[in-house]
Amino acid sequence: MTFPYYASAEQIMRDRSELARKGIARGRSVVILTYADGVLFVAENPSNTLRKTSEIYDRIGFAAVGKYNEFESLRKAGIQLADMRGYSYDRADVSGLSLANTYANALGGVFTEQPKPFEVELCVAEVARYGKPKPSQLYRISYDGSITDETRFLVMGGATEPIAAALKESYQPDLELGAAVAVAVGALATPADSGNGTAASPRVLTAGDLEVAILDRNRPRRAFRRLSAAALEELLPTTGESDAGDSGADGSPSGDSPDTSA
């Protein structure tokens, strides 16, 4: 007589958590931080089509790490929900907190009830309506539906500890856009611990390696805006110059550089 396979509920939840964390850790990191004029998204992402950041509604932005097909379906569902709520009631009734709670309920339900959890971690960011002094808000939603709020910065993806440590040292409230981009890119370039006791040198991230977007509170209606590679190079002239000097080339960095990240 064979006995059916048995695992305790605690073991099942541990296995699901481990699966989700491993999937998220395989993704390249994303930094989201507040600056003087809104919210800045900086993702290590050389792709020009598979985006990690997006607009959800007028004053609300979205960022994610993990399995692309899973967080892309969540992104589209969030846009549809926000559009429906704004159409049915009022555009002012669509808030980042309500959307974050909806995402948390959806991810928590999948984690508890389905055999496989979503291997994603999300951020919903919101800036105040034009002309209002309310501070910007960041909401992190984990694979198990847990939600936390932040008003300074957060890091998602693989090797978050050294990046978060670098941000704690360099981040200051109310930075200008150029300084905020420099802080975020510098933190993303922080190498992970090699494990052999020797300090690794910081990585070099060019404009072609990055996906950068902002929520600009000074824009009257739609706050979300992407920064092109050319605009990013202007914000980070030091990075462009050092990159050219290291390579010995006389051209500026491009999106065609090979991807050397893990």
Swiss-Prot record:
Residues 235-262 are annotated as: Disordered. Pathway: Protein degradation; proteasomal Pup-dependent pathway. The formation of the proteasomal ATPase ARC-20S proteasome complex, likely via the docking of the C-termini of ARC into the intersubunit pockets in the alpha-rings, may trigger opening of the gate for substrate entry. Interconversion between the open-gate and close-gate conformations leads to a dynamic regulation of the 20S proteasome proteolysis activity. Coiled coil: none annotated. GO terms for cellular component: cytoplasm; proteasome core complex, alpha-subunit complex. Keywords: Cytoplasm, Proteasome. GO terms for biological process: modification-dependent protein catabolic process; proteasomal protein catabolic process. InterPro entries: Ntn_hydrolases_N, Proteasome_alpha-type, Proteasome_asu_bac, Proteasome_sua/b. Its main location: cytoplasm. It is found in: Cytoplasm. GO terms for molecular function: threonine-type endopeptidase activity. SUPFAM superfamilies: N-terminal nucleophile aminohydrolases (Ntn hydrolases) (SSF56235). The keyword Cytoplasm applies. The keyword Cytoplasm applies. PROSITE patterns: PROTEASOME_ALPHA_2 (PS51475). Component of the proteasome core, a large protease complex with broad specificity involved in protein degradation. The 20S proteasome core is composed of 14 alpha and 14 beta subunits that assemble into four stacked heptameric rings, resulting in a barrel-shaped structure. The two inner rings, each composed of seven catalytic beta subunits, are sandwiched by two outer rings, each composed of seven alpha subunits. The catalytic chamber with the active sites is on the inside of the barrel. Has a gated structure, the ends of the cylinder being occluded by the N-termini of the alpha-subunits. Is capped by the proteasome-associated ATPase, ARC. NCBIfam families: 20S_bact_alpha. Belongs to the peptidase T1A family. This is Proteasome subunit alpha. It comes from Gordonia bronchialis (strain ATCC 25592 / DSM 43247 / BCRC 13721 / JCM 3198 / KCTC 3076 / NBRC 16047 / NCTC 10667).
